[in-house]
């Protein structure tokens, strides 16, 4: 009798509004940012084993249940496994319009469709919601022996409800 309630995807936010969902991926981070017409994943959580990661065990089932059939963007803040472990499963499981990261040039994620490095000053608007990349600076990519956390893609998201700072 209650099964139909479980099969209905939640309504999308109105124009200008944002829904942020922080997913429980254990140690690590994964955030779904949803506007009226767009979906972005910020970090993809950890890899648990060679065959299991937060992408195939948590994010893909969640996104399918939420009615998301494609991602407009996928941002990996830095190369630590607790932030990037589920990314390749996401890319295999859903169409992704573009990707961004601060990954080193030899990282496989850099081969993803429409990949671009995160750079301070990048900005875009989706459905009245403003997204602004605040870090890293272009010169940060040239620093030798940089620490991964110091390269984190920092994203500010502003909507009618207020702003959120995602630091990775």
Functional labels for PLM-detected ranges:
Residues 1-168:
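Non-globular, low-confidence helical/coil segments that flank catalytic cores
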């Amino acid at each position: 009798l209650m099964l139909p309630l479980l099969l209905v995807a939640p309504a999308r936010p109105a124009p200008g509004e944002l829904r942020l969902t922080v997913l429980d991926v254990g140690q690590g981070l994964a955030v779904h940012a949803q506007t009226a017409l767009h979906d972005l994943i910020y970090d993809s959580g950890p890899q648990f084993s060679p065959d299991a990661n937060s992408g195939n065990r948590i994010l893909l089932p969640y996104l399918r249940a939420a009615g998301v059939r494609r991602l407009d963007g996928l941002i990996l803040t830095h190369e630590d496994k607790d932030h990037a472990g589920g990314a390749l499963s996401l890319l295999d499981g859903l169409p992704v319009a573009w990707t961004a990261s601060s990954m080193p040039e030899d990282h496989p994620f850099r081969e993803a469709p429409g990949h671009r490095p995160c750079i301070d000053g990048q900005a875009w608007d989706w459905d009245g919601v403003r997204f602004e990349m605040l870090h890293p600076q272009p010169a940060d990519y040239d620093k030798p022996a940089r620490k991964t956390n110091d390269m984190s893609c920092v994203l500010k998201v502003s909507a009618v409800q207020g702003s959120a700072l995602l630091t990775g």
